[in-house]
Amino acid sequence: QPKITSSKIDHELKKWSEKGVEGHFDEDPWVSHHHKGKTAMAHLVGAKTHEVVAMNNLTTNLHLLLASFYQPEGIRKKMIIEKGAFPSDYFAVTSHMKQKGISPEDHLIEISPDENGYFSTEKICRSILTTGDALALVMLPGIQYYSGQFLDLKSITHAAHKVGAYAGFDLAHA
């Protein structure tokens, strides 16, 4: 972490201890902090500043995405994730399945990496195509957090769309 991080955090903690709720409205108000990084965030994702916002945390945002994009219907109930997914990602995925009455044991497909810890795009796409109409969502990382492997998002998305499924990517490590 940058050396200045500790002193910046200490400054905000001191402000909180001395001013409490008034810290939201003083000379450097907390109430508008979410605007400070908009230009950098927009540039990072290729968006306009009015199209981005810093909010929540990674797991909360994943829950929000799953609430919108995991919509099991008919035989289309399965979800594909990577074996060894980040623990909070795994729990978010399985909790959404259970909430919708879907058994993760029967409907969650975990793609395993090879012996070197890398995920084969061919294996992922083959699993997607084999699962076919039963697949509701592919939820994978953009960059796998153990190995740093960048997954082929375009090929995976193409395969998912070919069978009528959504493709979602957690870019927390990207």
Language-model regions, residue ranges each:
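Pyridoxal 5′-phosphate
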Residues: 1-174
